A protein has these predicted regions:
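Oxyanion-hole/transition-state-stabilizing segment in secreted/luminal serine hydrolases
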Residues: 61-77, 86-125, 144, 148-152
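Cell-envelope and extracellular/periplasmic
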Residues: 79-84, 106-119, 128, 135, ...
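Conserved beta-strand elements of the Class I
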Residues: 54-56, 77
Length: 235
């Protein structure tokens, strides 16, 4: 009887979890306030340069420890944080994007939104809002949008991630001084599986070799964006 009761409770709990409705991220509170406060404290202690190359987004950027070396000679500010959603990159942009008056922004975020259950249209709309606010305050800024990774651990979400990347690329086609970089060609094999050594054991985040591969496809776009803004930032 105890075994039967245990099984019934387990089934009930599983069913409740499966049927639990997704709460849209736009209706959820912003997380990781401590990370943002830490960035602000670091800025107070050692003010970063204005008109730099700003990286903003989620953990793929946060974990890129040698991004400054890979992106030389440009001055780099890395403000990737946690496993952030686009709601948070947008919600905190007054604190960790706009104060820097960046010359070029490298933006990668959105995959976590989709993995959480938000439809593709939701992060795409937030990215459009982010871009509009950025350009209102900093009209000469260029943006390099980085595709979300089709990581092996998220294989079930690949079709949605592919659609997200297509729509992200469309944003770039519609605007000026925008670039789109598909890092999946650097990280993954033609069949979609990760190249040997590209990912950590979690099959989600890039390993050191993966970051080298990302840099090889990202740096040319950063070079082009920096050159395109040369005249605007000479004044």
């Amino acid at each position: 009887m105890k075994i039967l009761l245990t099984c019934l409770l387990a089934i009930t709990a599983f069913a409740a979890d499966v049927t639990k409705p997704h709460i849209p991220l736009a209706q959820q509170p912003l997380r990781m306030a401590k990370d943002i406060t830490a960035f602000e404290a670091a800025d107070q202690a050692n003010p970063p340069p204005q008109h730099a190359l700003l990286f903003t987004g989620a953990s793929t950027l946060r974990m890129w420890k040698n991004v400054g070396e890979e992106m030389k000679p440009y001055p780099v500010i890395n403000r990737g944080f946690g496993g952030s959603f686009t709601t948070e990159v947008l919600g905190y942009m007054d604190r960790i994007t706009l104060p820097y008056h960046p010359r070029v922004v490298v933006f990668q975020c959105g995959g976590n939104d989709i993995n959480s259950g938000d439809p593709v249209a939701a992060p795409i709309a937030r990215i459009r809002e982010y871009l509009a606010r950025l350009r209102k305050e900093n009209p000469d800024c260029a943006v390099v949008f980085v595709a979300t990774t089709r990581a092996p651990s998220r294989k079930a979400k690949w079709p949605l991630l592919d659609e997200y990347n297509r729509q992200l690329e469309q944003i770039v086609k519609e605007g000026k001084n925008l670039w789109y970089v598909d890092i999946n060609v650097a990280l993954n094999l033609p069949n979609g599986e990760g190249k040997p050594g590209s990912y950590l054991k979690d099959n989600l985040h890039p390993a050191a070799e993966g970051y080298k591969a990302i840099a090889s496809v990202l740096k040319p776009a950063v070079d082009a964006a920096w050159q395109a803004t040369e005249a605007a930032y000479k004044k």
